[in-house]
């Protein structure tokens, strides 16, 4: 069963990315990138993780509202392409791992800069 869930998760990720780029015309969602999908074992719910390039709290709220508004349309379009009996209910959550990764990169760059300054003294 786990293999099937993983296959469906990959299919949902691929199809939602296409739907977001081609079919959803909401300007609030132009900077959204879907990073991962996790389905329950019975495939009744799919948690969709997304990332943004901005750290603006107001923009994050607008994007979440846009995703919630487009959820029904996305689920309908998914139903036309997925090979499952019932299309999972979509739940959108912000993926902070990209933001966390860029913070780590900045900290590493800062440490390297400090090391270079110490070495030159």
From Swiss-Prot:
Keywords: Cytoplasm, Ribosome biogenesis
GO cellular component: cytosol
Domain of life of the organism encoding this protein: Bacteria
Gene3D superfamilies linked: 3.30.300.20
One Pfam family from the record: RBFA
Location(s), subcellular: Cytoplasm
Coiled coil, from the record: none
One GO process term, biological-process aspect: maturation of SSU-rRNA
UniProt GO MF annotations: ribosomal small subunit binding
InterPro entries: KH_dom-like_a/b (IPR015946), RbfA (IPR000238), RbfA_dom_sf (IPR023799), Ribosome-bd_factorA_CS (IPR020053)
Subunit details: Monomer. Binds 30S ribosomal subunits, but not 50S ribosomal subunits or 70S ribosomes.
NCBIfam families the record matches: PRK13818.1, rbfA
PANTHER family, per database record: RIBOSOME-BINDING FACTOR A, CHLOROPLASTIC-RELATED (PTHR33515:SF1)
UniProt similarity note: Belongs to the RbfA family.
Record's function text: One of several proteins that assist in the late maturation steps of the functional core of the 30S ribosomal subunit. Associates with free 30S ribosomal subunits (but not with 30S subunits that are part of 70S ribosomes or polysomes). Required for efficient processing of 16S rRNA. May interact with the 5'-terminal helix region of 16S rRNA.
Protein name: Ribosome-binding factor A
Species: Lactobacillus acidophilus (strain ATCC 700396 / NCK56 / N2 / NCFM)
